[in-house]
């Protein structure tokens, strides 16, 4: 067993230091950098943190559905955090279900989940070259989201990518905040770690490996610290019986210097190196560090400036060191979060992972009497949050998130004289002051499909329910126009709310572009563009290819207007909601 352990460790070390680091060094000679995903399914022979740590850049991966991403992105972000890498990429939205049916609103919550886990550099998967403009939607495969010029919503994809850029930028600022470092052990091959005991809600963690502990980790101000500045409050050892003496000696030094370490004692060395003396060293060190612990009872052992914690769950351990949750909210809420910190500023990313509106209080562990702001990555707006209060160790802020909405809660402005500001509510009541009833003049982009260039709708409907099959199966761009009279009698910001659109839209008001919508709350701020009296609104909507592909399944092949290399849509499939569905309202907040 020791020989096998040494061979496996040798393989992992050589893959990391000869293959990855070797390729990195050669690349640098030619002005290049290496980028890799630090895992591999169906036969990964390395240790994921060490393997990724030797590369210049690191990446994870997730699909728009399913399980892929459950371990890959934490593997990448932990590697990036402990090895001091600013950008942590992810091959994103790798597959999106059936061809040409997915659109950015369906991708958002999944992407936000992994932003909260530490991803901060989005790599879109994928863009396939299209050799022809006539064969649409064109070349595709069974995998991959169709981020290419022949997709119907490509002209409005900037609404989505601007969002991704804003989130990426914010999450690249400062350093990641995590309270716990879970040691993954020294065994190989290894593609992920375990969080045992489990971390309570409101805390973040990273995995950490022996290389970084032994070489880089030190104690500063009672915190486990890495050279690039990231700090942890507790180092958790895995439930294993083995550890090399060299590593256990470093753990001992960390504790005596003031660190908090938690876990069970090792019994012997896993390696054949210096056997049997190494086992005796382990027994001697373990006896010193776990002084008389019986293996079951809770025990706190004081060693130098630090402590060894035994027989505890994570909540008990965190309570012992008076470590409050980094963020606290109702545990039943479907919210994920991440936290970055730079000098004088705390940046929290929060995401509603549900399809429901959420109104809740959140307690943030911030110091120095900082005032909160909400930075909206969808539209770039900044909202002062006037309504907040002091808690034990932080600030409580009433918050509101629309379905699948995300936001940055930024603390950067210090309050004078420690006075809490009480003014307007954070989220004033939204009041509808006008409904745009039409009629609506609607233009279709593609007249080659037998559509009239313009039709008039007395009222908005889901086009997939239109009695005209050509309209019902339409895919592409269409423009809605109407006039309306408005006189403003309210105080507050005015919004044009589309409420329900299939699937994305850009809006012009009085010939001025005022923004686009692709996710909740599907509204744009028109305060600076709406006038008293007559107004003209023009809304450019894009659908997906799904309905046209289904419609063509009713046609003989020679009569079809679409061509896709991989197309499994049939007559039996349901149509997707399409067009401007509404109701369209003017709201004041």
Which residue stretches match the model-derived regions?
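Exposed aromatic-hydrophobic patches
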Residues: 396-399, 523-528
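Short, well-ordered loop/turn sites that connect or cap secondary structure elements
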Residues: 401, 507-509, 530-531
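Short, well-structured beta-strand segments enriched in hydrophobic/aromatic residues
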Residues: 406-407, 494, 532-552
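Glycine/proline-rich low-complexity spacer/linker segments in large multi-domain proteins
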Residues: 415-438, 543-586
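Beta-strand/loop-rich accessory regions of lumenal/periplasmic or secreted enzymes
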Residues: 460, 466, 500, 517, ...
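Aromatic-lined ligand-binding clefts that engage carbohydrates, nucleic acids, or primary amines
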Residues: 484-510, 518, 537-541
């Amino acid at each position: 067993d020791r020989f096998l352990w040494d061979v496996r460790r040798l393989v992992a070390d050589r893959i990391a230091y000869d293959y990855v680091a070797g390729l990195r060094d050669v690349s640098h000679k030619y002005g290049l950098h290496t980028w890799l995903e630090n895992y591999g399914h169906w036969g990964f022979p390395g240790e994921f943190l060490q393997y990724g740590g030797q590369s210049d850049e690191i990446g994870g991966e997730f699909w728009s559905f399913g399980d892929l991403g459950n371990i890959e992105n934490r593997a990448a972000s932990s590697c990036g955090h402990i090895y001091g890498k600013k950008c942590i990429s992810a091959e994103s939205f790798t597959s999106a279900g059936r061809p040409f049916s997915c659109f950015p609103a369906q991708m958002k919550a999944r992407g936000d989940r992994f932003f909260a886990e530490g991803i901060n550099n989005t790599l879109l998967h994928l863009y396939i070259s299209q050799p022809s403009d006539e064969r649409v939607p064109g070349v595709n495969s069974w995998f991959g989201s169709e981020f290419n010029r022949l997709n119907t919503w490509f002209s409005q994809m900037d609404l989505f990518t601007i969002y991704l850029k804003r989130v990426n930028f914010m999450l690249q600022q400062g350093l990641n905040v995590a309270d716990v470092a879970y040691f993954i052990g020294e065994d190989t091959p290894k593609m992920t770690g375990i969080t045992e005991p489990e971390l309570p809600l409101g805390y973040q963690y990273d995995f950490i490996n022996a290389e970084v502990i032994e070489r880089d980790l030190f104690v500063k101000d009672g915190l486990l610290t890495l050279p690039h500045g990231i700090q942890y409050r507790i180092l958790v050892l895995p439930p294993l019986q083995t550890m090399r003496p060299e590593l256990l000696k470093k753990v001992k030094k960390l504790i005596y210097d003031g660190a908090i370490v938690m876990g069970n004692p090792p019994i012997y060395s896993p390696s054949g190196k210096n056997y049997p003396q190494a086992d005796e060293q382990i027994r001697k060190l373990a006896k010193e560090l776990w002084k008389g612990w019986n293996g079951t009872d809770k025990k706190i052992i004081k060693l130098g400036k630090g402590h060894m914690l035994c027989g505890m769950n994570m909540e008990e351990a965190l309570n012992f060191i008076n470590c409050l949750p980094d963020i606290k909210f109702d545990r039943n809420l479907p919210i994920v979060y991440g936290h970055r910190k730079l000098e004088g500023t705390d940046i929290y990313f929060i995401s509603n992972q549900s399809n429901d509106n959420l109104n809740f209080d959140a307690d943030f562990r911030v110091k120095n009497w900082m005032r909160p702001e909400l930075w909206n990555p969808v539209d770039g707006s900044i909202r002062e949050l006037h309504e907040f209060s002091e808690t034990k160790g932080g600030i409580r802020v009433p918050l509101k998130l629309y379905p699948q909405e995300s936001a940055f809660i930024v603390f950067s402005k210090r309050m004078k004289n420690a006075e809490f500001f009480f003014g307007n509510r954070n989220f004033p009541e939204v009041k509808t002051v006008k409904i745009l009833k039409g009629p609506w003049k609607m233009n279709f982009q593609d007249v080659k499909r037998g559509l009239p260039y313009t039709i008039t709708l007395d009222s908005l409907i889901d086009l997939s329910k239109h009695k005209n099959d050509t309209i019902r199966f339409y895919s592409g761009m269409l423009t809605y126009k109407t006039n309306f009279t408005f006189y403003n009698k309210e105080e507050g910001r005015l919004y044009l709310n589309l409420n329900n659109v299939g699937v994305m839209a850009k809006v012009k008001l009085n010939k001025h572009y005022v923004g686009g919508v692709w996710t909740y709350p599907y509204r744009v701020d028109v305060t600076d563009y709406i006038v008293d009296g007559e107004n003209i609104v023009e809304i450019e909507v894009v659908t997906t290819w799904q309905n046209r592909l289904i419609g063509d399944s009713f046609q003989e092949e020679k009569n079809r207007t679409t061509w896709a290399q991989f197309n499994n849509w049939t007559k039996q499939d349901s149509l997707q909601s399409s067009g401007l569905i509404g109701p369209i309202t003017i709201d004041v907040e």
